[in-house]
Amino acid sequence: MNKYTILLWCWLGLALLPSSLYSQDNIRSLQQVQLLSHDECVVVQINADWNFSANIDLSKLKNCAIFNASIDNPEFGAAIKDEWNIKSVPTILMFEYGKEIQRFEAGLSFKLDKATILKKINNEIDEIQLRKFR
């Protein structure tokens, strides 16, 4: 388990006990991701360990919470794939107040166009910020 997956689980308020990770309760707990009401904007990048080089550096994004998760994690990778309907990696999901508002999925190349994706994400974050004043 890397530091990003631990952060994701801690942020969701989930216990990291191995026996609980395989229970049906864990799948319901993953649904908490869609209830991210304490953050206006959340960006989650889902990838596989074998495709790590295709990750996009999201650390420079402002005004949003950023998380990374691996579908290769033996404890909850399958639950992530099912919960978020992940068909290809990397996939980047954007949530606004817990509702998925944007999805970016890689094609056959297993890569995303970094410049285009970052521009679209930043534009969406700007829109979220503007909606606060409407």
What is each model feature region?
Residues 26-65:
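Local sequence-structure signature of Cys/Sec-based thiol-disulfide redox active-site neighborhoods
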Residues 83-95:
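Structural micro-motif
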Residues 64-73:
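A short beta-strand-loop structural module common to alpha/beta enzyme folds
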Residues 21-23:
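Boundary at the C-terminal end of the N-terminal hydrophobic targeting segment
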Residues 73-80:
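N-terminal post-signal-peptidase region of extra-cytosolic proteins
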Residues 94-134:
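Non-catalytic, surface beta->alpha helical segment in thiol-disulfide oxidoreductase systems
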Residues 9-19:
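Bacterial N-terminal signal peptides
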